[in-house]
Amino acid sequence: VSWTKADIAFETIQQRQLVAKLMKSVKLFEGLSGDEALELLAQAEKSVFAAGDYIIQEGERGAFMYVIIAGKVEITKWVNGSYEKPLAEFGAGDSFGEMALVDNLERSASAKALTGCTLLRLSDQEFRLIPAIGAKIYRNIACLLSQRLRNTNAMISLLMAETDDAAA
């Protein structure tokens, strides 16, 4: 189901509240004006998943990402092809799948709905159609991926320290 401008126009208080809530809670939308958010949302596809559904699968190709409107999503990675290891849990306002949007390569991890989820699916096509919005979104994606890389580096440092302590 896709939203149309009529679905999310600033005509009702509820619709204005939705846009305002997204503007405040979704880091990906930081720096967008209300009109820009409305234009982006009009291009986005609304997706609904039941608990346990895979949203994206590690190894598949994708040129889109998701923003969580409601629900919880778990990010997992296969370890040695034998089991899935949880890496992160995301909730409303968070986004995932950005790497494939940026580089159009295979997904590096899977995402599974932990609860029923309502998501916005965004593709690079929306950002190309509206270059001014795309530039802001891609900058926000760069900041988000940078923060995640810093967190990953910190975790690797802790694991290396634990390994060094165990070997001593």
Question: Language-model segments: which ranges?
Answer:
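Cytosolic regulatory regions built on CNB/CRP/Popeye-like sensor folds
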Residues: 1-168
